[in-house]
Amino acid sequence: MAISLKVLAPNQNVYEGDAEEVILPSTTGQIGVLPGHISLVTAIDIGVLRLRMNSKWTSIALMGGFAEIESDEVIVLVNSAEIGSEINTQNAEEALKKAKSAISKFPENEKSPEKIKALNEISKAEARFQASKN
């Protein structure tokens, strides 16, 4: 028995297909989904969705959104997403280093909008880098 998975971003159908297992990065932690899962709507954090089909894992970098789980169907609506195999690992790693370097100019206790944006860029770059490695 398989789960029907759709990952949708504005103007883009990122992924549509079956999966035996889905792991979602929710704002409260990872959610593992198997066939027959209880109904659930959850916020999706910046992170990596992992799906397993035929013993093969696929990663998708997600940039925040929502997911609806209904028995054997998962619909993920996100701001943007990229399939890991389509991300250049070297470019993703360089973007992560650049994002980490940008945060170093802020004092540790600062809570400015600029620092929050820089931290968000680190999260995005980390998600892309992690997804690119799988």
UniProtKB/Swiss-Prot annotation:
Any one Pfam family match given in the protein's UniProt record, by short name: ATP-synt_DE_N
Highest rank taxon of the organism: Bacteria
Keyword entries, A-Z: ATP synthesis, CF(1), Hydrogen ion transport, Ion transport, Membrane, Thylakoid, Transport
Chief place where the protein resides: membrane
Cellular component per GO, a single term: plasma membrane-derived thylakoid membrane
GO molecular function: ATP binding; proton-transporting ATP synthase activity, rotational mechanism
Membrane topology: Peripheral membrane protein
InterPro entries xref list: ATP_synth_F1_dsu/esu, ATP_synth_F1_dsu/esu_N, ATPsynth_dsu/esu_N
Compartments where found: Cellular thylakoid membrane
Biological role stated in the UniProt entry: Produces ATP from ADP in the presence of a proton gradient across the membrane.
Family (UniProt): Belongs to the ATPase epsilon chain family.
Subunit structure: F-type ATPases have 2 components, CF(1) - the catalytic core - and CF(0) - the membrane proton channel. CF(1) has five subunits: alpha(3), beta(3), gamma(1), delta(1), epsilon(1). CF(0) has three main subunits: a, b and c.
PANTHER family cross-referenced by the UniProt entry: ATP SYNTHASE DELTA/EPSILON CHAIN, ATP SYNTHASE EPSILON CHAIN, CHLOROPLASTIC
Name of the protein: ATP synthase epsilon chain
Gene for this chain: atpC
